[in-house]
């Protein structure tokens, strides 16, 4: 991990994944100084995180799993970062919530860099237009994310992601 952090040369943040962990384990992690957590299911997060966020104001919560449109309002209210913006319908819904609420959580666009049909995410060829559309709706696009194919070198996909981020002037 240290070698990768040094290689990246930027601020690197480790996100503790708390899915399927009991409340006691999460609280122990918080008391140990971990303050950035990821959950992949809105419903599980709703059962776990409201009291933690109320009692520990330095905690930051990321949604790292797919976001169904019927859970968007709940996710919008609970999560500080939504890392899985992956389609125009969801972008439109989040834009409406942004207008309604007067704020927008930090958003990462999920890019399907491997162009795998079984995975969600914006295809690389569609990304530039998708970013412009999101920005025109006043969505706060703070980053890109991908899940590289299992049988390919992850560094190639992260390199591609970085080029797309630079090309679109996304600073995170």
Predicted features by range, described:
Residues 1-172:
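Conserved alpha/beta-domain cores
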